[in-house]
Amino acid sequence: MKFKDEIIIFDDFIEKDYQEKIKSELFGSREKGTEFPWYYIEDVTAAYSDESQHRPGLSHSYVDLPLEMTGDEDDILEPDSAGKVMSNYHKLFVPMLKRVGFKLGLSNVRVLQGRSFLQFPVNTDGTIDLPHIDILGKAEFIVALYYVCDSDGDTVIYNETKESKTYTINKSVTP
């Protein structure tokens, strides 16, 4: 893959009015009749699993990851496998995803998974979320991570790309 093991950061890569549009849609407004459909999730990193840290938040899925991409290293993936759009709000993020593709020199960007999380400020003891892998198996993918507002800490990116007993930090990114 062209960007294997690279961490590329684009600061302020979308226009301010587009940033505000995303923020306005996600936060909604009762006065304007625009309530965004957030759904409770028990833990944004490892919900309902033994690894859960029980850090609740709200979640919204735009594109559902195909089942065959949630498996283990021996899974065989179809080359045209792509996620199913589950939310009308997906189109809100398409211009940003196209911009990511453009900045990376990619002419065709397929979305395998799209989701948003609204985390509550429960990380008051300085601990960080457990390491996790966004897509298991043999899929080659790029993660486009966008912060709508301040976060409760850095995003930690590890060297390991498979489940491991120990993890070493590659980079810590302050949003």
What is the meaning of each model-derived region?
Residues 1-108:
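Non-heme Fe(II)/2-oxoglutarate
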Residues 75, 79-175:
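Catalytic core of non-heme Fe(II) oxygenases with the double-stranded beta-helix
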